[in-house]
Amino acid sequence: MVGARAGRVPAAAAAAAAVLIVAACVFSSLAGAAAAAEVVGGAAQGNTERISGSAGDVLEDNPVGRLKVFVYDLPSKYNKRIVAKDPRCLNHMFAAEIFMHRFLLSSAVRTLNPEQADWFYAPVYTTCDLTHAGLPLPFKSPRMMRSAIQFLSRKWPFWNRTDGADHFFVVPHDFGACFHYQEEKAIERGILPLLRRATLVQTFGQKNHVCLKEGSITIPPYAPPQKMQAHLIPPDTPRSIFVYFRGLFYDNGNDPEGGYYARGARASLWENFKNNPLFDISTEHPATYYEDMQRSVFCLCPLGWAPWSPRLVEAVVFGCIPVIIADDIVLPFADAIPWDEIGVFVDEEDVPRLDSILTSIPIDDILRKQRLLANPSMKQAMLFPQPAQPRDAFHQILNGLARKLPHPDSVYLKPGEKHLNWTAGPVADLKPWK
């Protein structure tokens, strides 16, 4: 971790270092903004750097021809009808489950012959039951998922051949298929037992956590490409903000003391740096939020209730170096995106020294991170555009699935063999879903 190596820097020296970094970053703003313009609708130019080694090759892989996916035609109550009832689902950070379904329906990897399929996909929208405030209610999600699996296992023979081992589901909620927004409750619930053998495509990723199943594919949350395009600023705009963050520091409704929410990391950010002139941090979310990220050198990406957030996507797209404060986080497409090279990792316990850590990074290292971030392929991999584009997040998911092939013989059940307990889990999850 970067934070483990930096000592405390006097305030005057830190400020001077920040000024030098901001000045040095002015020339590289052109590359980052221009690359963002290409990704969301313009033409790129400027100073970029290709990802070296195998990661760069993986990022640019083409999954077409490497796998075939059969898309289950589930009743609309599991997907399309839910969106029709509440279209807000199309714009929230969990919308990857909707757009992945739409993408696969017209994708070249789709097969209409299930006997030819390498993978089976069940489109179940588990995060589209929203409150009046637009927040998802995951408490019915286990019943909904269970109902969908019961339906497809009765109508088609393919689930029963493997107990779901050649199936994948998109579960983009805070803690994935644990289906709860609070970590303690998510751990208590655990992953839905019926998904024990399936591959989970989820935004949540944390090492050695009960809500991250081995073999899962960690993806970025949804951030609307069209909205970001509408807020692009001139590519020669200087990066005059050293550190930027907008968001909650305390969740007073659920955690008034600030010790549990974000494991206290956000509270520590506020208490230590609310008056630091190098830090532009606030709970207010201005209309110029996207523009401000494009004017910033570092964008803070601390954990909240879960370790991930759309800030990570926004930072990469806008060329702002992500400062990742979430211990043991598993980042999206980590086999394709060199997060150590483009970001800065800070241990949660080192947040009080964040000013020293960031001002101690050599300018040459910062400029290289910016050149890597300016690579259009890097940005494209974080987005779910409509229509899909080469090397985008849809294609990175397919690449991840393709790399799991061929399935070992052990996934196919022998006569009489079963792995799943259909009555396991909390009693409330066994109630019928309507």
UniProtKB/Swiss-Prot annotation:
Residues 1-10 are cytoplasmic. Its EC number is 2.4.-.-. One of its GO terms (molecular function) is glycosyltransferase activity. Signal peptide: none annotated. It is a single-pass type II membrane protein. It is found in: Golgi apparatus membrane. Glycans are attached at residues 160, 421. Belongs to the glycosyltransferase 47 family. This is Probable glucuronosyltransferase Os02g0520750.
